[in-house]
């Protein structure tokens, strides 16, 4: 089954990640994208902490596409298993 859009969860300053979810049927898949990956995608300078959600929303389609690709490839990390996206995940 293909992943579908879940929800924005929050920006975690101490970990420098944005947490979000994707949905597989009726199961939520926890996901995270590093702020450095988002900055690299946007070729942005320093983004203020209060702008991370807005930045995520601008990049959401690209981030979720890559999360879906990692899901299909079963590239899970962590406990509970989820998808973690870093800058290298967007290099082609």
Predicted regions and their residues:
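Short, charged/polar N-terminal "headpieces" of proteins
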Residues: 1-27
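A short, structured beta-strand/loop element
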Residues: 19-44
